Amino acid sequence: MDLPVIQPGRPAKATGQPPIFQKIGIVGLGLIGGSVALAARELWPTSLVIAVDNKDVLETAMRLHAIDVAADDPVVLAEVDLVILAAPVRQNIELLAELDEHVRQPAVVTDTGSTKRAVVEAARALPPKFTFIGGHPLGGSAKGGLENARSDLFKGRPWLLTPSGASGNALEKLTAFVSALGAQPRIIDAAAHDRVLAFLSHLPQLTASALMQVVGDAVGQDGLALAGRGLADTTRLASSPAEIWRDITATNADEIGVALDELIAMLQDLRRDLPVGDRLADVFNGAASWRRALSV
């Protein structure tokens, strides 16, 4: 392991908020992890933000003054109060076992993954050396990476927490931390999370990617030059990175399968109805009503 790199000191500024956690460790400085780091540095200048990632990402983070300590090995997290696992889902699960060697109570460990059952089950299988509380901030973007991170990414957005029997004090502190970032913490069961997010997030992503692939293959580059805003708006998510979504689909395949089956059934229904259009009005009117109910 390379020695940790320490960021030069920064002047403290009064924020009116005492630190909830004195030492914050973040593993994975993508859009979510980077945004948490930036927000924490703004909110609690006297807290120490420690990050674990690859060398290039850490160098960028140091240039952006997003972190205080950069390292490539989780051993630096031995004394932290809060660990945030912000890597892809299956990598977070592997990291839990590594943390078990270094992190000790009363440390709180959370993650930011888009599925919850697998990581919660993995945490349950470990000895109780730290308190794990699953987490999922619903404040992402189609453009990922540290370069797109910003300190206000979570403002006004839900941040789902799956405590799974965690102690009240740990949950209280993590809830306060999430609230301070501007998010709206909400408690949800891990199974319910995966079922709901299959429809709210995973199905829209797969639909957007499949639609863009079908359209692109059918009309080619010349045809796409004629496209209007409708196609661009509908397929915005098609720019999302496949490496992240491979983990999401693998750890929520059953619930995503249910969601896909329901969409396929609806499309098949519309396909059969094309010559007469009897179902078209019902579907369009129902969809318009639900669209108005969206709070985003």
Kindly give the residue locations of the regions a language model identified:
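Glycine-rich, N-terminal phosphate-binding loop of Rossmann-like dinucleotide-binding domains
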Residues: 86-88, 113, 163
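NAD(P)+-binding Rossmann beta1-loop-alpha1 motif at the extreme N-terminus of oxidoreductases
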Residues: 2-73, 78
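Rossmann-like NAD(P)(H) cofactor-binding subdomain of soluble oxidoreductases
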Residues: 97-147
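Residues at the starts of beta-strands that form the adenosine-phosphate
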Residues: 23, 48, 131, 158, ...
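Internal alpha-helical scaffold of NAD(P)-dependent oxidoreductase catalytic cores
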Residues: 151-236
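Interdomain hinge/lid region at the active-site interface
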Residues: 220-290
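Rossmann-like NAD(P)-binding element
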Residues: 74-108
